[in-house]
From Swiss-Prot:
It is an enzyme of class 3 (hydrolase). InterPro entries: Creatin/AminoP/Spt16_N, Creatinase/aminopeptidase-like, Creatinase_N, Pept_M24, Pept_M24B, Peptidase_M24_C, Peptidase_M24B_aminopep-P_CS, X-Pro_aminopeptidase_P. One of its GO terms (molecular function) is manganese ion binding. This is Xaa-Pro aminopeptidase 1. It is found in: Cytoplasm, Cytosol. Signal peptide: none annotated. One of its GO terms (cellular component) is cytosol. A peptide binds at residues 88, 405, 498, 507, 533. It comes from Dictyostelium discoideum (Social amoeba).
Length: 627
């Protein structure tokens, strides 16, 4: 299995932008658009499984625009080229896009959505092109509803031929066309999953019976991996594999490149499973439709899947896997806790090393934002059951910290100097996924920096302390983390928390904590894992973010109402002492931090002491002294 895991560790190595100029690619795309009488062409970020993180071959939006953020959608007309992205990426987009591109602020009140902009800027009966594999049924329906006002038609790519792929093919002599990965798939043992795949399938089939469904189509990659207790490495940082699954009452069909499955993995598959070629899922659904079978498809799935099924045979409904996966069982919860303990050991060793290198040896050493990432990864690799990072490490000094999802480049990243340093990182372990952010200061912080950090910390602590009814969803409590920033007119342009998978995707739904309307709003429930990550970003100066992973858990209250829940912090890394203004904290906030430091002392300090690294031991002891 180690050979498989090493493939997950490796990052995408193909330069998706290549040698061909962006303007030349856009020009070629417009030629193809004219051939098909298209007035606009939409290039989403997602792949055929609506994944946030995708393999190199599916990075079509980055290929045609040069924007490398994980979220965003491009619209190209015959005269305009626009990128919609959210507040995490506005500064990054300004840096990466050429000057003739327009950045549109996604999910901001008062700013036009893609469909609103198309309605205002296209003429009646114009045609908009998109690949039906890359747009979800839910989003397609909402777009179609808006555009029908002008009878604007959404036209799907002819014969499934994506126009960006055609552009790539046109320049194949000038730059390499990436291939889909063929990495091996492996079985994840019961000691990590806590539930066998056959048990999960039994529960799914019971739900299918309730809905009178003959088939259920599963297209989300993390849901497939969870359901079958399999993991892969087709997408960097995400232990998933390109596939579809169709669940029936007597069998399961896994649509996948069979070469990825060795004999041992095949022998570990659940009973009654058949293997079919990856792309044959569409024909399989068409044949099932002809037989009059009731087919359950999740509205988050692609239009291409829906187009295989007649309306009379369709059941359009969120599948039960989404929620089942989000609510961790006892084995997964313990695994997440164990993974975070080992991850804390790695991060604390790194932070102690940084303090020594940047502060104590500042005249002797020189480190960049990129080079220190490699040092941090090295500490994580030493931990038991480490598989890979869970996303590209965000390592940013001073002004770069204001770029919320800043990614340091090997050749252009800044030298680490004294000032505000933000590091957002995480790892994949066989027993859990981690995501943690700490903001440090190497030097003497200003009073303004201390004030801003303390306000972010108070929001972070306030959310950690919150007790609330189990009928509450994440949107209801998002403001708790913002209140101390709002009181002085400050805010941050991202959600406060996202779900985290168990050795799966670092971003997991449906749970989340955000002021925005959540696509699949669901009440927070015991067993869910979420991040708590308020921040503040001052363009040109610094960025602050503090992030822990928390598990939703039952809590006791004064009146012992068993229907209340709260959060259990499982990230165990100290905050930055020199950035905390004690006079701004309440007694409850100080008590929380001191209790947190006591827990770190009990669970992490003994493990740091076992490393025999006196610098790390001294650093941690100093950091967790009571406030």
């Amino acid at each position: 299995m180690q050979r498989v895991l090493n493939k997950i560790i490796s990052k995408d190595t193909i330069n998706t932008m290549g040698k061909v100029a962006i303007s030349k690619k856009v020009e070629k795309l417009r030629t193809f658009m004219k051939d098909q009488s298209l007035s606009a062409y939409i290039v989403p970020s997602e792949d055929a499984h609506q994944s946030e993180y995708i393999c190199v071959k599916d990075k079509r939006r980055e290929y045609i625009s040069g924007f490398s953020g994980s979220a965003g959608c491009v619209v190209i007309t015959l005269d305009n080229q626009l990128l919609w992205t959210d507040g995490r990426y506005w500064l990054q987009a300004e840096k990466e896009l050429e000057s003739n591109w327009k950045i549109m602020k996604d999910r901001v009140v008062g700013e036009p959505t893609i469909q609103d902009w198309l309605l205002s800027n296209l003429n009646k009966e114009n045609k908009v092109g998109i690949d039906s594999r890359l747009i979800s049924k839910g989003y397609y329906d909402s777009m179609k509803l808006v555009l029908k006002e002008k009878s604007i038609d959404i036209k799907f790519d002819e014969d499934g031929e994506n126009l960006i792929d055609k552009v790539r093919e046109s320049f194949k002599d000038e730059e390499e066309i990436p291939e889909y990965p063929k990495n091996s798939i492996f079985f994840l043992e019961d000691k990590f999953t806590g539930k066998q795949s056959n048990e999960k399938l039994k529960e799914i089939r019971e739900e299918m019976k309730k809905q009178s469904a003959d088939l259920m189509v599963v297209s989300a990659l993390d849901e497939i991996a969870w359901l079958l207790n399999l993991r892969g490495s087709d997408i960097s940082f995400n232990p998933v594999f390109l596939s579809y699954v169709v669940v029936e009452h007597e069998k399961v069909t896994l649509f996948v490149d069979e070469s990825k499955l060795n004999d041992k993995t095949k022998s570990q598959l659940p009973s009654g499973i058949a293997i079919s070629p990856y792309s044959s899922v569409f024909e399989y659904l068409r044949n099932s439709d002809k037989q009059g079978k009731k087919i359950w498809i999740d509205p988050r799935s692609s239009v291409a899947l829906y187009n295989c099924v007649s309306i009379s045979n369709l059941l359009e409904k969120i599948n039960p896997i989404l929620l089942s996966k989000a609510i961790k069982n006892e084995t997964e919860i313990q695994g997440m806790k164990n993974a975070h303990i080992r991850d804390a050991v790695a991060l604390i060793q790194f932070l102690a090393w940084m303090e020594e290198e940047i502060v104590e040896k500042s005249d002797e050493t020189s480190h960049t934002e990129y080079s220190v990432c490699e040092k941090l990864e090295g500490f994580r690799r030493q931990q038991t059951d480490f598989v890979s990072l869970s996303f590209d490490t965000i390592s940013s000094i001073n002004a770069n910290g204001a770029i919320i999802h800043y990614k340091p480049d090997e050749t252009t990243s800044a030298t680490i100097v004294k000032g505000m340093y933000l590091v957002d990182s995480g790892a994949q372990y066989l027993d859990g996924t981690t995501d943690v952010t700490r903001t440090l200061h190497y030097g003497k912080p200003t009073q303004h920096e201390i004030d801003c950090y303390t306000r972010v910390l108070r929001g972070h602590v306030g959310l950690s302390l919150l007790k609330f009814p189990n009928r509450v969803n994440g949107r209801d409590i998002d403001c708790v983390a913002r209140t101390h920033l709002w009181s002085v007119g400050l805010d941050y342009a991202h959600g406060t928390g996202h779900g985290v998978g168990s050795f799966l995707n670092v971003h997991e739904g449906p749970q989340g904590i955000s002021y925005r309307a959540i696509a699949n709003p669901t009440n927070l429930q015991a067993g869910m894992t979420l991040t708590n990550e308020p921040g503040y970003y001052e363009s040109g100066n610094f960025g602050i973010r503090i992030e822990n992973v928390m598990i939703v858990a039952p809590v006791t209250t004064q009146f012992n109402n068993g229907k209340f829940i709260g959060f259990d912090n499982i990230t165990l890394v100290p905050y930055e002492r020199k950035l905390i203004n004690l006079e701004m904290l309440t007694k409850d906030e100080i008590n929380f931090i001191n209790d947190y430091y006591k827990e770190i002392g009990e669970k992490i300090l003994p493990l740091i002491e076992k490393t025999n690294n006196q610098k790390s031991i001294n650093w941690l002891k100093n950091q967790i002294k009571p406030l």
